[in-house]
From Swiss-Prot:
SMART domains: TPR (SM00028)
Lineage of origin: Eukaryota, Metazoa, Chordata, Craniata, Vertebrata
Gene Ontology cellular component list: cytoplasm; nucleoplasm; nucleus
SUPFAM superfamilies xref list: TPR-like
Organism this protein belongs to: Homo sapiens
Keyword Nucleotide-binding found: no
Protein name per its UniProtKB record: Tetratricopeptide repeat protein 4
Length: 387
């Protein structure tokens, strides 16, 4: 205690205080073996703030936070604090936390439209870098309602429209921004890019429409050719001609049905004659052959001669010769078989009243007539000879 009348600034008093201070052990200092960890807990020297602040672990930081986010402060002050916090997270490229901070600022519902517009625009920027382009677009739209001439919001909105492939909208946003600043470089570059992409998109739409119209006309011509020949299609077996045409159209627009993996399709030549993709099945060996364009006026024997001009690798007994082969088609509804004369044309068979073309790909069974397999295969089935 100071002596009465003694000057507290005198050298004697100061020396006495220092001697007393030095005689007492220092408490609260850093431990030598973990000073870096303890140093990191001091708010001023933290390299990065913790995601969750525990008052027991970081009492100083918790105290600062309570001061910064004091609920007794005005909504404007709190919103600005959250905006600044979000900006710090944004600079660190921690966009998720930036979104959270800007959202908290907006929740304060402050009366300053400019501040709210900035919060929306900044949150849009964070959402943009997170790849949430639609959310970002919603935010810049909200910002423009508060501040229609907010150039940053317009630029960000144009970027979002580009990412969402809304090229016409991107051009419109750029035009609106250029009315505010006709020399804004970002808007000029973006508008040129968006306009180019818009024209490409419009060209592609026109090409797609022309292609669709051409295919629709081709399908209609094919349907009329099929109807004129009295050929029955299992997919379009309906009374309504428009529905039948639509059924054909769907098949062509889908490429081909799953039963035809080769990409071939029914076609009509310049003379008005049809060529069909045709499948030959050899049940004895679980093998098959696919003919991509079997002209309707061609005979079965003509194709068999080509396919079996050389013995196939799977015909170990070398019995699959054109003269030995029998061709059948199956009536699935009646579980009946019809033997096809080898010299008949494809059109003659397809016009048979019990033949229904499935998946636009006629299919036929082929086996060696004199073989035990064929006899066993036909046993118990009704077999009819086409004349």
């Amino acid at each position: 205690m100071e002596q009465p009348g003694q000057d507290p600034t005198s050298d004697d008093v100061m020396d006495s205080f220092l001697e007393k201070f030095q005689s007492q052990p220092y408490r609260g200092g850093f431990h030598e073996d973990q000073w870096e960890k303890e140093f990191e807990k001091v708010p001023l020297f933290m390299s990065r703030a913790p995601s969750e602040i525990d008052p027991r672990e970081n009492p100083d930081l918790a105290c600062l936070q309570s001061i910064i986010f004091d609920e007794e402060r005005s909504p404007e002050e709190q919103a600005k604090t959250y905006k600044d916090e979000g900006n710090d997270y944004f600079k660190e490229k921690d966009y998720k936390k930036a979104v959270i901070s800007y959202t908290e600022g907006l929740k304060k519902k402050c009366a300053d439209p400019d501040l709210n517009a900035v919060l929306y625009t900044n949150r849009a920027a964070a959402q943009y870098y997170l790849g949430n382009f639609r959310s970002a677009l919603n935010d810049v739209t909200a910002a423009r309602k508060l501040k229609p001439c907010h150039l940053k919001a317009i630029i960000r909105g144009a970027l979002c429209h580009l990412e969402l492939k809304h090229f016409a909208e991107a051009v419109n946003w750029c035009d609106e921004g250029l009315q505010i600043d006709a020399k804004e470089k970002k808007l000029l570059e973006m508008r040129a890019k968006a306009d180019k992409l818009k024209r490409i998109e419009q060209r592609d739409v026109r090409k797609a429409n022309l292609k669709e119209k051409k295919e629709r006309n081709q399908n209609e011509a094919l349907l009329q050719a099929i109807k004129a020949r009295n050929i029955r299609l299992s997919e379009a077996a309906c009374e309504d001609e428009d529905s039948a045409s639509e059924g054909l159209g769907e098949l062509f627009l889908d490429g081909l049905s799953t039963e035809n993996p080769h990409g071939a399709r029914l076609s009509l030549d310049g003379q008005g004659r049809l060529s069909w993709p045709v499948l030959f099945l050899y049940p004895e060996y679980a093998q098959s052959d696919f003919i991509s364009a079997f002209h309707e006026d061609s005979r079965f024997i003509d194709h068999l001669m080509v396919m079996f001009g050389e013995t196939p690798s799977w015909d170990l007994e070398q019995k699959y010769c054109p003269d030995n082969l029998e061709v059948y088609f199956e009536d699935e509804d009646r579980a009946e078989l019809y033997r096809v004369p080898a010299k008949s044309t494809l059109l003659q068979v397809l016009q048979h009243q019990r033949y229904f073309v499935k998946a636009l790909t006629p299919a036929f069974l082929v086996c060696v007539g004199s073989s035990p397999f064929c006899k066993n295969f036909l046993r118990g089935r009704k077999v009819y000879q086409i004349r």
